[in-house]
UniProtKB/Swiss-Prot annotation:
This protein's encoding gene: Tagln
Name of the protein: Transgelin
Spans of repeat Calponin-like: 175-200
Similarity-based family: Belongs to the calponin family.
GO BP, sorted A to Z: cellular response to platelet-derived growth factor stimulus; epithelial cell differentiation
Cross-referenced InterPro entries: Calponin-like, Calponin_repeat, CH_dom, CH_dom_sf, SM22_calponin
Organism from which the protein derives: Rattus norvegicus (Rat)
Positions of modified residues (N-acetylalanine): 2
Chief location bin: cytoplasm
């Protein structure tokens, strides 16, 4: 962000709207989960958007996070012993995390762009990606998730049903509720259309 000048006019307005989407309460929950999932050696960030960005910026913590969701021996991201100090190495580490998260099942619409994190352009998108990763981990329930399962929403899972041919045939003869009831109402006492009403005293 050192090379980027201040925003004015419409750009400033757009950036302001993006920054308002950042959720400080969600940040606390995500930090708790990351620390619980990766271990206390990852440390804790300073509070706020900037602290969260600096904490995750080099991609090492994110890589450890996605690796912790896999069994030993099949970790998708190689984590360097010393955090990378060169800018392109840090961006490459973040890109490896994004690829591993996508392979884990996070949809492209839930993914942030590398610059969103690296330049702090859209930290709410970073939160969305980590949130989606947590939701998937809770949904998979494969024993690798650590933390409170109530921190994330469980995604809906497919529930296939198999019907026999006889069940399908029976279903064709049932009057659906959208059609109304076939009981109670009858045409008893009604006269045909066009006939005058007969009043006999």
């Amino acid at each position: 962000m050192a090379n980027k000048g201040p925003s004015y006019g419409m750009s400033r307005e757009v950036q302001s709207k993006i920054e308002k989407k950042y959720d400080e309460e969600l940040e606390e929950r995500l930090v708790e989960w990351i620390v619980m999932q990766c271990g206390p050696d990852v440390g804790r960030p300073d509070r706020g958007r900037l602290g969260f960005q600096v904490w995750l910026k080099n991609g090492v913590i994110l890589s450890k996070l996605v690796n912790s969701l896999y069994p030993e021996g099949s970790k998708p991201v190689k984590v360097p012993e010393n955090p990378p100090s060169m800018v392109f190495k840090q961006m490459e580490q973040v890109a490896q995390f994004l690829k591993a998260a996508e392979d884990y099942g996070v949809t492209k619409t839930d993914m942030f762009q590398t610059v969103d994190l690296f330049e702090g352009k859209d930290m709410a998108a970073v939160q969305r990606t980590v949130m989606a990763l947590g939701s998937l981990a809770v949904t998979k329930n494969d024993g690798h998730y650590r933390g409170d399962p109530n921190w994330f929403m469980k995604k809906a899972q497919e529930h296939k049903r198999e019907f026999t041919d006889s069940q399908l045939q029976e279903g064709k003869h049932v009057i659906g509720l959208q059609m109304g009831s076939n009981r109670g109402a009858s045409q008893a006492g009604m006269t045909g259309y066009g006939r005058p009403r007969q009043i006999i005293s």
